[in-house]
Amino acid sequence: KALGGRVPAFDDLPNLDYASMCFKEAMRIYPPVWMLNRTAVEEDEIGGFYVPAKTDILLLPYLTHRHPEFWEDAEEFVPERFSTENSENRPKFAYYPFGGGPRICLGNSFAMMEAQLIIAMILQRFKVKLAPEHKVEAEVSLTLRPKRGIMVSLEKV
């Protein structure tokens, strides 16, 4: 609706809030990089735990993005979680599908932009539904991916 039927362009990104929220919610539930590794460069304390220098630390976006302290009904797809009002009080690293800090994925902004435009173009033309008998299961590898793909039906709008 924000586009009036025309193909989306870069200048439309600020008006594609719902496409952005949908992509962020998909990345919350199934972050492609499900595990990140960091090494402590010096001794530190994290959450009351002593961490010696050179300790490997695993960060698990897949688990953090489902943690009930941060996400109510975490297994449900609810794009509105990422509205401005619902995001403003969320802890900084409750959501980090692209990592964070100085080692955040360089492609973060490009991926967000590309996804918003693609989602908008698809939804302009089709109503998308998950195939009724298809169950999405994650396959853990270097990245998280759908085990048997994602079967959808497309209905022209």
Annotate the PLM regions.
Residues G5-G47:
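Conserved cytochrome P450 K-helix E-x-x-R motif and the immediately C-terminal K′/meander segment
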Residues A9-D17, R103-G107, V140-L144:
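Conserved, non-catalytic sequence blocks in retroelement Pol enzymes and Pol-derived host proteins
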Residues L13, L59-S87:
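Conserved cytochrome P450 K-helix/beta-meander segment immediately N-terminal to the heme-binding cysteine loop
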Residues E85-Y95:
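Active-site-adjacent bridging/hinge elements
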Residues S109-L144:
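Cytochrome P450 heme-binding "Cys pocket" and the immediately downstream C-terminal segment
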Residues R145-V157:
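C-terminal helix/juxtamembrane-tail motif
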